[in-house]
Amino acid sequence: MSYLPCELHCHTIHSDGDFTVSELQKAAVDDHLAIIALTDHNTFSGWDELDDNIIPAIRGIEWTTYFGHMLVLGANDFVDWRDAQPDNIDEKIKQVKAVGGIVGIAHPYQLGSPLCTGGRWEFNVRDWRNVDYIEVWHQNLYSAKRENERALELWTSLLDKGYKIAATYGRDWHREETSGHYGCTYVDVDDISAKSVMRAIRLGKTVISHGAKFIFRVHRHGVTSGIGDTVKKGNYTFSFFTDLHSRVKDAGMEDIVYKEIKI
């Protein structure tokens, strides 16, 4: 198990960002990320400028509609978002899945109309089994934001109903910021590739943090299981690991608020 840092929500001058594609990739390297996803609003035009020699990148898009924003990663063919409506989103998601993509709900409780039309998730998902991940933390301030608290509550409620959906962090990266404390999503992968990261997300093998990387495992009868695995009811030995210098320069114990560690 090797949890590596990624950012799954990025924009460039091909939509409303200030980065060129190259500048975004170089900024990601400077931020000690291992892989990013390029998710410009309603366009693939930046894909041809990606250079995986700078940093590996997942080809993605942010469906930006009047009823919410949906992140689509790794689709092998075009799926038209322009006819997405509140009551046909399940069919649109199935179309994405049919061409190899995964889908995530971006900032589900962001301020919506009339100030940010479409920013809040208003699609009527009937089959949550087809949703791969939810952005439970968005931008900075994390759990201090009510919109993030509500997103976390949504994710937790779906887990309680038996759905297997990954939690992710979304920086929603448009430009280089001079202030703020931003986190990332750690994915459990054996190699850095779009295929491996997407598989980890499908399996729920993600950790989000704005400081140290932390992971946990359970052990029973010589078998070790990690985040995203399913285990049977019983007695297990629990192990917890934290890497205080995993990504953020000079990260230390002061970055960890134990009451906010959620398993």
Where are these regions (language model features)?
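A metal-dependent hydrolase metal-coordination microenvironment
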Residues: 1-116, 120-123, 129, 135-155, ...
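Short, structured coil segments at secondary-structure junctions
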Residues: 52-54, 130, 163, 182-183
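C-terminal functional module detector
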Residues: 1-3, 23-24, 100, 161-166, ...
